[in-house]
């Protein structure tokens, strides 16, 4: 059986789809998946053993110059790659009109997705041949697992979902694996940032622990923040610019991770590493860290500025058994 997945973004959403593949792989021996995903996240599906072909799409970039000759050529090549197979099923796990119209509609195969009541954008359901009712008040991982089970005709397992990508990195861990913590400090929303002075205070409080700390970054302004956080601390390393796979390798070797609510926090969860995520305004119940050893540290009044470094340090100590 060959199935096409349409789940293009974001990083967390793409990662949250992986346990559904593991369920399907266990329920339907020999099943293989192709996956349409935004080019920036194209490495992620390749880490799962059930994925045979990754088809990158660049809707975010294309829409800036949709009718230019180079972009038209890219769109034509994408359509040819998408239509090269006749699929037993096409599962649109994105639930948005944009992806349904520009990707799902063009694919060959019976198209499955969430129904009018439960799709993220109800109009997207008009592009599906089979519409499935998937209750909204459950974690995103469980919603996707249920969608795959209903689309492919098996019962959703009652056990916790398995991302099944940690083993991809086990044979190539950093030489200092287990000797450091990683602090993913960057996120896209201002109200999800933990103040820099709190990060620096936490780093100082860990001085006697013997643990080294690594700071990842993606954009230039994130690198500047990382440098400010590391200033004056000999045991803190600002990582070089890395591919997503490179960052994943560092996370896979971490003793533990302290993170804001960001894509790298979800990647840590997918790699089964102990992870303390500090939450302010977002609800971890529906889109938070999912998996083994995932710990939620809520800010008082949902205001991250009110969450002190001492409180996070105590949280680390109280959960030492999981770390």
Tell where the protein language model's regions lie, with residue ranges.
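Catalytic machinery of carbohydrate-active enzymes
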Residues: 1-323
């Amino acid at each position: 059986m060959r199935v096409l997945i349409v789940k293009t973004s974001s990083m967390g959403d793409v990662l949250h789809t992986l346990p559904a593949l593991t369920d399907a792989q266990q329920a339907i021996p020999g099943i293989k998946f192709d996956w349409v995903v935004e080019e920036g996240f194209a490495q992620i599906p390749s880490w799962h053993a059930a994925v045979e072909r990754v088809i990158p799409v660049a809707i975010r970039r294309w829409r800036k110059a949709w009718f230019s000759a180079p972009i038209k050529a890219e769109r034509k090549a994408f359509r040819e790659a998408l239509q090269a197979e006749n699929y037993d099923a096409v599962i649109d796990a994105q639930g948005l009109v944009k992806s349904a119209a520009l990707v799902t509609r063009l694919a060959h195969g019976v198209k499955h997705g969430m129904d009018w009541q439960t799709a993220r954008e109800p109009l997207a359901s008009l592009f599906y041949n089979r519409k499935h009712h998937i209750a909204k008040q459950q974690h995103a991982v469980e919603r996707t697992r249920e969608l795959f089970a209903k689309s492919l005709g098996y019962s959703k397992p009652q056990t916790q979902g398995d991302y099944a990508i940690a083993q991809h990195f086990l044979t190539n861990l950093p030489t200092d694996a287990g000797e450091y913590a990683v602090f993913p400090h960057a996120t896209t929303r201002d109200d999800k940032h933990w103040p820099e002075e709190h990060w620096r205070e936490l780093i100082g409080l860990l001085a006697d622990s013997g643990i080294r700390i690594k700071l990842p970054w993606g954009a230039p302004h994130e690198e500047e923040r990382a440098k400010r956080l590391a200033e004056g601390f000999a045991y803190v390393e600002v990582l070089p610019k890395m591919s997503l796979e490179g960052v994943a390798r560092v996370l896979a070797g971490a003793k533990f991770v302290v993170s804001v609510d960001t894509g790298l926090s979800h990647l840590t969860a997918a790699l089964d590493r102990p992870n303390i995520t500090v939450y302010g305004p977002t609800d971890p119940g529906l889109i938070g860290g999912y998996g083994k050893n995932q710990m939620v540290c809520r800010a008082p009044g949902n205001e991250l500025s009110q969450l002190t470094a001492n409180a996070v340090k105590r949280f680390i100590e109280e959960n030492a058994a999981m770390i």
